[in-house]
């Protein structure tokens, strides 16, 4: 069973991503939901996952800060409302870069790339 971490600071966006993942990949297990850089770093230090769905702008910083604090080898599907981070995203384990609001078809295509 694939385990994933959902990193999102907006509850509505979290609920929507979770709903789409449950529909598209019911066999994937949500290990945790984190909303900050600090929560994510602490979680990843102790809990390996197979995939991360990672919002770029978080309440306590930029999600790229995570990669500066710990070594992350987990594949990442980035989500953001902004497109200026695309180049940076592909330098750190990026499977795909999805603009919000994330469309189900786009998430499905990203999951297929991951698999």
Model-derived regions, located:
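Conserved acidic carboxylate
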Residues: 8
């Amino acid at each position: 069973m694939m385990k994933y971490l959902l990193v999102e600071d907006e509850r509505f966006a979290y609920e929507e991503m979770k709903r789409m993942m449950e529909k598209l990949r019911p066999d994937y297990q949500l290990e945790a939901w984190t909303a900050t850089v600090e929560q994510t770093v602490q979680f990843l230090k102790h809990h390996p996952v197979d995939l991360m769905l990672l919002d770029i702008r978080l309440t306590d910083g930029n999600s790229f800060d995570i990669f500066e604090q710990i070594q992350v080898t987990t594949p990442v599907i980035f989500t953001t409302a902004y497109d200026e981070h695309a180049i940076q995203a592909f330098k750190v384990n990026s499977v795909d870069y999805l603009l919000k609001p994330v469309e189900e078809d786009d998430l499905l295509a990203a999951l297929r790339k991951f698999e």
